[in-house]
Regions:
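N-terminal extracellular ligand-recognition/capping segment immediately after the signal peptide
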Residues: 32-34, 38, 42, 50-78, ...
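Parallel beta-helix/beta-solenoid
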Residues: 75-83, 96-144, 204
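Bacterial N-terminal signal peptides
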Residues: 4-16
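Boundary at the C-terminal end of the N-terminal hydrophobic targeting segment
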Residues: 17-23
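Intrinsically disordered, low-complexity Ser/Thr- and acidic-rich flexible linkers and loops
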Residues: 177-197, 222-228, 275-281
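Short glycine/acidic-rich loop motifs that flank beta-strands on beta-rich extracellular proteins
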Residues: 64-67, 83, 88-95, 119-125, ...
């Protein structure tokens, strides 16, 4: 009897474990009430108390109600969609926005799989707020021509990968922020409270093209308030073509730009702000193992406007058409720059203030051969 009871208890325990391991069925957004797909997604999330996957089926949807995704829930829900789900945002705010939840901490929020199309009046496609652990992947984000495809505001330790981001003002813009310490929490450059910089953001394996301002823009919209620079962000393996500008770091520390494909942008890699002083400087940026197609319309592949301890190595280029003053690297203000082992084939490897040459010795910089 004891053996039978033990076996029965063991089998019930295993069945309970199996039931707990079974994934919860996705909730179709179209099954919820609402005025449009944005409103329906919001209602579906409320119905399951943020404890489910809300799924957007294939279809063409027009919506003006912003999708609100609450942060700090640590992996209890996600927003997923079919690749054939096309969401056309007609509003003037953020198509998908996040809000800080009832407690601080990680979110483990996942947004994936569908197409998000904007309009010239929209602020952004996806607006991420301060938290840890958000992933945006396998998305198409296009047409936010007056704003940002993805706006990263004070977010930490998050991943943006394998997306097509095109025809936006900025593909991905990262900004610091300050948030109130009392609820309801408000964040913004004019708010008094706790500072959040964008740190450890990993932007990898995306195609970011035809941005009218920048493909990737670390924008220092506010300094002071105890804010640090944007720290140790990673931009790797991206295809950055035909943008007005590719990557611009205004105020950063330890950012890595690696193994990207650059072609056809008016400006490619820009480090620091002209005459910005220490408040707007790139500290310790690493620009490594990237490829550049060099053309006349892009005078410089890498611009060091104001940087300290920049490391530039292992990059290569294919020279198409060049002008007499094209330079692989143009330096305005820098200290302790290390440039080596780059496969440079154009006439001028280095320029100082737009004129072929290097800074005078004594600033701690090292410049090695072109090839």
């Amino acid at each position: 009897v004891r053996l039978i009871a033990f076996l029965l208890a063991a089998s019930l325990y295993l069945l309970n474990l199996h039931a707990q391991a079974l994934p919860q069925a996705a909730v179709p957004a179209t099954s919820a009430a609402g005025t449009d797909i944005g409103d329906r997604v919001n209602h579906a999330l409320k119905t399951c108390a943020l404890q489910c996957t809300v799924y957007i089926p294939p279809g063409n949807y027009s919506f003006s109600v912003s999708i609100h995704l609450e942060l700090n829930t640590f992996g209890t829900y996600k927003l997923s969609g079919d690749p054939g789900a096309v969401l056309n945002y007609t509003g003037a705010g953020d198509a998908i926005t996040t809000s800080i939840g009832n407690q601080a901490g990680s979110s483990q929020l996942l947004i994936e799989g569908f197409q998000l199309r904007g309009n010239p009046h929209a602020a952004s496609g996806i607006h991420l707020m301060p938290t840890n652990r958000i992933t945006v992947r396998n998305m198409v984000i296009i047409g936010f021509s007056g704003g940002d495809g993805i706006l990263v505001e004070g977010t930490n330790s998050s991943n943006i990968y394998d997306n097509l981001i095109a025809n936006n003002k900025n593909g991905i813009r990262l900004i610091p922020t300050v948030c109130t310490t009392t609820r309801p929490i408000r964040c913004g450059p004019s708010v008094e409270g706790y500072p959040y910089a964008t740190n450890a953001i990993h932007v990898t394996d995306n195609q970011i093209t035809t941005s009218t301002q920048w493909a990737i823009f670390e924008d220092a919209v506010v300094i002071g308030h105890g804010l640090t620079e944007a720290m140790n962000n990673l931009y790797m393996g991206n295809n950055l073509e035909a943008n007005a500008g590719a990557i611009y770091l205004t105020r950063s520390r330890g950012t890595v730009i690696s193994a990207n494909y650059f072609e056809g942008s008016g400006r490619e890699v820009v480090l620091g702000v002209v005459n910005g002083g220490g408040g707007y400087r790139a500290y310790g940026p690493v620009v490594r193992d990237n490829y550049f197609t060099t053309i006349t319309a892009t005078p410089y592949n890498i611009e060091i406007q104001d940087a300290d301890s920049a490391l530039i190595e292992g990059n290569s280029e294919l020279v198409g058409s060049i002008a007499p003053k094209n330079c692989f690297v143009n330096i305005l203000t820098s200290t302790r720059t290390w440039i080596s082992k780059n496969a440079i084939y154009q006439k001028n490897a280095y320029c100082l203030n737009g004129v072929p040459g290097t800074p005078p010795s004594g600033d701690g910089s090292f410049f090695f051969g072109q090839h």
